[in-house]
């Protein structure tokens, strides 16, 4: 007679590990045996996957997740949600958060949410709040966080010790950071104001996307940009497969990065591509991803490969703005490249600015921003790591060209009809218009309250649905083949077209013919 199975209570970390194994094809039966639990428990974990991941992602401490065994909700659940949202935003900004500040804010949200009863934001409440969300520490002394040079030095020293201990090379050290991009904003002769564009009555927010850059410390492995737009399939994509885009494209109703998208990107894109790159360099498949404390970045325990060899590490809130590598001119260089590219394209097409603006699509912007990222030189990136890794070497043979300057863009403007007289001040405003745009949604107190109460912005969802209903244009093989024939005829007539260009089109024609034969064998 078999003995009764001993009751096993899993930690949150155990549940996360089980979820990862399930996503990788592990069976409920096998996992039940490994963890000494019933298959029903495994199925319950699968059922509550998103809830567990969301809870873990919002936690502040990996070590506490390894101890915590329940996700017991607060007695005041709406207040708890509002406080966590507020806390994460304050931490991301590097603002000081003390016990008294938390207590005062909790009292404000309690009454703003219209909650009943007596509420005392005591030290006991604060302790329970921290425990529920695995928050390591709250700065009780209310010290100033921004601009803390001592904290910068401490972090850099600790990080270098960590790198040495883990035996990591610069090739294995990565940074990722998000930014907002007003992709359709063009300069005006008179002014460039945040929220307005050159077309009267047009709101910049309607053409805002989130762009995330990721690269290693040498600048020799730049991953494809991760872009978040509002629609799952924007109209300009037509029948384009998103897998064939020059960026990794995701959608979110506000075009913001969120916890779910970041986790997908880490698991499905970052980890596999880093493994492939390190393998090609003959290096151990081990890497660290350095991140700031954005509310959209999950807990370190969530951002970890199955074998634990590729993982995330966080910059302290009080130093991120000072030393995060991509924030040291790298993202700014990419944006300047992008805007210079837009003006150059307009100049080449010879259109007036308004016509160019109307024709500019999100698909055009994705190709342009991908090119702009490609133009950022490895040496520009490696120099941005100097404060954290002063010993990093600049690779020989890499020429360093100064990033595109305002003067360079001004030269292009002088040849752009309608923009010849843009003032240097307005030009600089345009170039810097989204320099402080975060990649995550910053909520006001009233928005935090609505979200805590479960209210959503239905208009955004309806807008996305309306975009999705636009029919796609289908191009058949016969039509595509005719276009390539016409293009080849055109190239043959041009005496200055080089042979490689014609060969590319001929190869494309052969590919289309093969597709046509496979679809219609009788032709």
UniProtKB/Swiss-Prot annotation:
GO terms for molecular function: DNA binding. Coiled coil: none annotated. InterPro entries: CenT-Element_Derived (IPR050863), DDE_SF_endonuclease_dom (IPR004875), Homeodomain-like_sf (IPR009057), HTH_CenpB_DNA-bd_dom (IPR006600), HTH_Psq (IPR007889), RNaseH_sf (IPR036397). The keyword Nucleus applies. It is found in: Nucleus. Residues 168-385 form the DDE-1 domain. Residues 67-139 form the HTH CENPB-type domain. Pfam families: CENP-B_N, DDE_1, HTH_Tnp_Tc5. One of its GO terms (cellular component) is nucleus. Residues 28-48, 100-132 bind DNA. Residues 1-52 form the HTH psq-type domain. The keyword Signal does not apply. Keywords: DNA-binding, Nucleus. Belongs to the tigger transposable element derived protein family. This is Jerky protein homolog-like. The gene is Jrkl.
